[in-house]
Amino acid sequence: MLETKEFKFTSTPEKGEVSALLVRPDTATHLLVLGHGASSNMRTPMLGAIAEGLAGHNIATFRYNFPYSEKGGGRNSQATVTETIRSAVQAARGVCPDLPVFAGGHSFSGRMTSTAQSESPI
């Protein structure tokens, strides 16, 4: 069975809440926190296909939006983006405390997740 739940979490104190989407198979062994590309959001069909494919391999996903993709406007500063990534990982750990957590993303969020990790462990 596949569990799908929507959540909100605080991205940064200044930017407020953003949306997240958990896709968790009953047999999940790991959780991937998965960010989107610069010009899309967590509901892009590609990320949906990735989440579905990973679920078939017992990997849960926690997709999330950045504040700019949630509320409109221009892209957020690097500091806001990396803080949002850290907040997403923390929120994912709270939702699935029983699973080892990994973080990554498509294009922009993949680079920014690497940047956040290089600044200080996520």
Which stretches of residues belong to each language-model region?
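Conserved hydrolase catalytic core segment
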Residues: T115-I122
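Gly/Ala-rich beta-loop-alpha elbow adjacent to hydrolase catalytic centers
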Residues: G105-S109, T113
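Serine-hydrolase catalytic machinery in alpha/beta-hydrolase-like enzymes
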Residues: F7-P100, T115
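Short, conserved catalytic or adaptor-binding loops enriched in Gly and charged residues
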Residues: M1
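Nucleotide-activated sugar donor-binding and catalytic core shared by glycosyltransferases
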Residues: T4
